Amino acid sequence: MKERVENLLKELKERLGIEREVKIELKRFKRKLAPVSLTKRVIYINRELIPKLSDEELGYLIAHELLHLKHGIYHISEFEKELLELSGKDLYLSLYRKTWKGYNFPILQI
């Protein structure tokens, strides 16, 4: 499980042009999917989700958090544009139906 996540992280860092070190930790969360610490440069992935997600969906979560490290905490236009170019609308909607819907997150208007 950890190797799968690390491989995706490496690939996505290259695609997004992120050179600084980023760590991933797998943890169990009751209500979080994949929070990020901007100061520690650590992405925390909810370990309960990993078996339920395809590589593409897991990659989306990792890319989303990597873009927070690249652009900051807010979803500015560059953030959203880069994420959609990387993953596409269909992948976002698939992931939303599998995960975020149960967490009562609003769906983005894309």
Swiss-Prot record:
UniProt lineage: Bacteria, Pseudomonadati, Aquificota, Aquificia, Aquificales
Pfam families cross-referenced by the UniProt entry: Peptidase_M56 (PF05569)
InterPro entries, per the entry: Peptidase_M56
UniProt similarity note: To M.jannaschii MJ0123 and MJ1213.
Keywords: Plasmid
Protein name: Uncharacterized protein aq_aa15
